[in-house]
């Protein structure tokens, strides 16, 4: 909307209508000690001057760096059609579709998104999304606690540390017992997790690929978890589901993910969306909205919000969660992106990303002193141990136009020399070669 300041004449007219002499008189009831003395702000500027100032500030951003950052958020290519379709006003300005008779387009889009997510994860049901991957994991944890009526949660240390911090924060006052099982050189410690499960365990939480990029098959572990009547929760990377064994195939009860990698640009932490899917037995424990397909009395297909007794606008205190909105626009972008790619396109995206990562691992470990930290199979992300501090390497390479990866030591004490490197289909062999040569000359 245009930036239109009030003229002195307009201010005078409004004050006259209100019946006060000045702006100061308007706020006279506020005690002097509570009024701001000065904000030290310059006088207001015109729209043109504001835009010029913002352009000058934006010019300080560096956008031509080659990035190998991952750690849960990935720079995949987004077709132009995603922006074009998702920015249509019918979607962009739509509100929560409480009135199905006037919201069929929005409801069908949500239904199609749910269908796509359930197929992608090989699970029975999906909701209309939550805020992000971390909140999806938290909600999955609460689902397990409600279903099992137990309070012990076993968490792999190889789970994204941002998610673990969020889980700790969200559950601080819920009297849950969070048991963290150490990783094994970047791999999820399946034996230790299985051994930790007992009659008091509500759920086991693992990630595949995990934070270090390591890939596991949890089928046997999940079977052991189920023997104790506990639930298996898996956090995933959506793009990789086309080349890996899915959560459903492994026997997961709840599968969650951050949907950023499909349709959402990297943008200072958001907005993204949390993907939530579950088995049929848990659908009534699912938080957030669920769109369903039905028929009206004339036999015409219609879409509605269903199983609403779970939601706060129906039962408030007894609701499965108090989420007041979802990320419907982000979910739409994910749906559009998936539809544009198709199964073959998504698979090709994943294969290219994995191939580039394995080529990068080969080039980097050919450098003296650089060794693989991630042991065993990995996807499009891996960790290497450097002979020097990873933070220092990142600073030096960034000055040369390359962000070499994520410093694992930020979240894992004792791993200050470990660098987490990610590749996507956008990463070229030329970029990898330049990265390797600059790194060789730096360390």
Swiss-Prot record:
One Gene Ontology biological process: nucleoside metabolic process
Keyword hit for 4Fe-4S: no
UniProt xrefs under Pfam families: GDC-P
InterPro entries to which the protein is assigned, alphabetical: GcvPA, GDC-P_N, GDC_P, PyrdxlP-dep_Trfase, PyrdxlP-dep_Trfase_major, PyrdxlP-dep_Trfase_small
Enzyme class: oxidoreductase
Top-level division of the source organism's lineage: Bacteria
UniProt-recorded Gene Ontology molecular function terms: glycine dehydrogenase (decarboxylating) activity
Reactions catalysed: N(6)-[(R)-lipoyl]-L-lysyl-[glycine-cleavage complex H protein] + glycine + H(+) = N(6)-[(R)-S(8)-aminomethyldihydrolipoyl]-L-lysyl-[glycine-cleavage complex H protein] + CO2
UniProt keyword list: Oxidoreductase
EC id: 1.4.4.2
Record keyword Oxidoreductase present: yes
Task performed by this protein: The glycine cleavage system catalyzes the degradation of glycine. The P protein binds the alpha-amino group of glycine through its pyridoxal phosphate cofactor; CO(2) is released and the remaining methylamine moiety is then transferred to the lipoamide cofactor of the H protein.
Subunit structure: The glycine cleavage system is composed of four proteins: P, T, L and H. In this organism, the P 'protein' is a heterodimer of two subunits.
NCBIfam families, A to Z: PRK00451.1
HAMAP family noted in UniProt: GcvPA
Family named by the database record: Belongs to the GcvP family. N-terminal subunit subfamily.
Protein name per UniProt: Probable glycine dehydrogenase (decarboxylating) subunit 1
Source species of the chain: Maridesulfovibrio salexigens (strain ATCC 14822 / DSM 2638 / NCIMB 8403 / VKM B-1763)
Phylogenetic placement of the source organism: Bacteria, Pseudomonadati, Thermodesulfobacteriota, Desulfovibrionia, Desulfovibrionales
